[in-house]
Amino acid sequence: NVLDRLGYPTRSAELAGIAGYLHDIGNVVSRDHHGQSSALMAMSILSRMGMEPAEVALIMAAVGNHEEEYGHPVNEISAAVILADKSDVHRTRVRKKDIPTMDIHDRVSYAAERSFLDVDAEKRVITLTLTIDTGICPVMEYFEIFLTRMTMCRRAASVLECEFKLEINGACLL
């Protein structure tokens, strides 16, 4: 969707979609370094399906670089995957619904009532708009766990020759 809106070739958007679908498949092996596990698993699956090696390599690069601990937006496909993955925060992702027992990650996600990634192709601006219930989680807790993700989004937007903005509860913060 990000690449489509910015006018990238349809095939690039399709490859980003495939990479997005496969980016966390390595979690079946381990949460640690799952980006690399996911990339290797994607290579095996896509190669067996007959995908061109150059396209497999693009997907591997996107999948292997989506984690904030070690990833970098190395091309437009990886940039799109990073933006989609790192902006995916919403209460529907939380399994435990008992707020007092939630860790900070679940509390922040549960507090996110709305999350929307807007791509303004004309202005070359990508904006993540969030509505956070501050009765559940103060905005500062969002930054405690998401600052590195937002930094990664800014780098990804830059690869796409865009500016990245973050709006929380109507206030533009980045």
Where are the regions a protein language model picked out?
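Terminal helices and disordered tails flanking the catalytic cores of nucleotide-processing hydrolases
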Residues: D88-L174
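Amphipathic alpha-helices of TPR/Sel1-like and other helical repeat/solenoid scaffolds
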Residues: N1-V2
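Divalent metal-dependent catalytic cores for phosphoryl transfer on phosphate-bearing substrates
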Residues: L6-V119
